[in-house]
Amino acid sequence: MINGTLDLHTFHPSDVKALVPDYLIECKKIGIYDVRIIHGKGTGVLRGIVHSVLSELSYVAHFQLAGESEGAWGATLVTLKRIASP
């Protein structure tokens, strides 16, 4: 189910490079432009992969670590670019 939150705890790091872009594209399709990606605090491996992937996606307007109430450095908040209306 696509609800704007992607929890990566159950995924292997090698899956994340394909999973994150696919999930974000599906979010855009249904009008979700603010997404939370939960990568966990741990050693930072998943966070690094997620941030690397996000920095390469042209449809990502902005991303940052979440605030304390949203998962702190265990989650990243992503804002997707909106499609301009003609």
Model-derived regions, located:
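Long, charged, low-complexity intrinsically disordered regions
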Residues: 1-86
